[in-house]
Amino acid sequence: MFVLRTERNIKFHVFIAVVMIGMSLFFQITKVEWLILFLVIGGMFVIEIINTAIENVVDLVTEEYHPLAKTAKDVAASAALVFACISVIIGVILFGPYITIFLIGELP
């Protein structure tokens, strides 16, 4: 897949996704929590792929600097950043109770 080979951010997201899936297996999260987790992980990948597509199309259309080209790239990157922030919040809500209970010593 082109994005995995070329985009540093997607590699980071793959790493985080693997960590989150590992934590989910360890904490034995519920089916609903799995659904939420996969929606968030999938959403992040989709946003990053769209961001990459927009950046590449902008680069294809113009080799010169243009304020609208910069705006298009910045807006696409901002969408990825906003979704990443929302993903962190969801992760804290999802895993916070499990981590707290684990630190107290009540989980396996």
Give residue spans per PLM region.
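Amphipathic, cytosolic membrane-interfacial segments at TM-TM junctions
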Residues: 58-75
